[in-house]
Amino acid sequence: MDSKRDEKILELVKILKNTKYLVFFGGAGTSTDSGVKDFRGKDGLYKTLYKDKYRPEEVLSSDFFYSHRDIFMKYVEKELNIKGLKPNKGHMALVELEKIGILKAVITQNIDDLHQVSGNKNVLELHGSLKRWYCLSCGKTADRNFSCECGGVVRPDVTLYGENLNQSVVNEAIYQLEQADTLIVAGTSLTVYPAAYYLRYFRGKNLIIINDMDTQYDGEASLVIKDNFSYVMDRVVKELKKIQFGKTLKNI
């Protein structure tokens, strides 16, 4: 066993054991074990051009959607297809933390719907979800097709580059961050704004960062774990359950 790895995990367990109000803030890295492509990792989507011509940020912009819908739809189908994806151990660990009563809210930058599929109840989607599509003409919920039965254009219920976030979701996310005594941030480089800015509203005691690369908040964190999100959270929940069922845990 890796003693340093275990030491970090046990430290997180100790923090969660004394946590009353946990909020989770996650990015693409929380879903990579489910088959979702990362964005800014070394092999992420943003490292390559689509059709050797378009930057992903360009394709996923509001302007591009309206001017090149066919290319936009093909890109989403090829690179952002969420059909058949299943929650990983990290997602399921968050469900267990919610059942235990520690986790109060999941704030996600992801658009894959995996937190809801896994069973989390209070999920705040900052960027929307690819599971939902709607008609721009009649507003009716629609299938993932080019047009609605009314003849209108259909688009995904996600925030594209150049668009504002849903303010009601933002307000609730800020409220949850303000209430938390512990915040776990995982699977995100914290470079996407304005979403990353909202962490400034956290005033709690414990900021935990779980990521495979450095973030701008590492220096402010109580604990930084550079490891796989799914592995860490699965281990943490198993150790917490040992405590819950009266088993002793070394160093806790």
UniProtKB/Swiss-Prot annotation:
Nicotinamide binds at residues 39, 111-112. Signal peptide: none annotated. It catalyses: N(6)-acetyl-L-lysyl-[protein] + NAD(+) + H2O = 2''-O-acetyl-ADP-D-ribose + nicotinamide + L-lysyl-[protein]. The active site is at residue 127. It is an enzyme of class 2 (transferase). NAD-dependent protein deacetylase which modulates the activities of several enzymes which are inactive in their acetylated form. This is NAD-dependent protein deacetylase.
